[in-house]
Amino acid sequence: MNASLLAEISRGGIKNIEVWCAHPHFNYAEQQAIRELASGLEEYGLVLHSLHAPTQRDLAPGRESGFPISISDPERVRRIDAVDEVKRALEVAERIPFRYLIQHIGNNRQAADGRSFDAAFNSLEHLVVFAKNRGVTIAVENTPGEFGCAASLQQFVKETHLKDLRYCFDIGHAHIDTGVAASLELMHERIVTTHLHDNHGEKDEHLLPGEGTIDWDAAMKTLRANPKELPLVLELKEKAAGDPSLDKVCEAFDKLEETAEKAVEGA
């Protein structure tokens, strides 16, 4: 995350951004990196809408590699280490205010068993309070796999009674899971933000909307049926957003907003 990219984003008319907490992308634990981001946001009139909590250590942007960390790791030492890492990300709010921390509850291969469930509860019970004290709401994201799917998240919230926990609805992950409409029905009451990207229903490709098989007309109509006006946050692979002018990203935003407006008018 550098000044030239922030400038390009601003010129494209995008005003609110989500930043991914991966050390090569944004070193959230370093005060100098935080100061530079704060300065860039102010200079280009941008707002930090959300941070995506770290999921791996030493992860290069756009790569699926590195040492994974999980707040639902049944092994106590690793879980506490993961929680501490998330707390470092939340501490960014002491310098740069943001509304939401997007959090994965586990990894894609993790089973929804009792040990993982208890570990996630112990972590989030602490993190929700830590976040709230800094003006941040934790939004758990639906992810591919058994433990992070919409049905599992619904069960988790129902049984843990974590009343301040909210959801980030990831439309691409829902498309891979039981479908957009079915996942949204399970999550709609607690959704506060979104991740929008496309795929072909088989793997997590993070394509631009329209490049996969999601029915965006139906999806936007379903999203806009939510009583809250949910923010539309594009979450793309580096390849998809690789055009330095961000023309394709801005075009995708325009199409989404147009589709959303039509959905509201037709409601």
List PLM regions with ranges.
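Active-site acidic/histidine proton-transfer and metal-coordination neighborhood
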Residues: 3, 43, 60-166, 226
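Conserved beta-strand positions in the central sheet of alpha/beta enzyme cores
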Residues: 18, 50, 102, 139, ...
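Histidine-acidic metal/acid-base catalytic patches
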Residues: 2-13, 97, 147-267
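N-terminal pre-domain/capping segments
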Residues: 1-88, 94, 250-267
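Short, small-residue-enriched loops and turns at beta-alpha junctions
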Residues: 25-27, 56-58, 108-111, 142-148, ...
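Active-site loop/turn elements of alpha/beta-hydrolase fold enzymes
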Residues: 21-22, 53, 105-106, 143, ...
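Catalytic-core regions built around general acid/base machinery
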Residues: 33-44, 123-130, 183, 218-223
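Flexible, glycine- and charge-enriched loops at secondary-structure boundaries
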Residues: 27-30, 34, 72-79, 110-117, ...
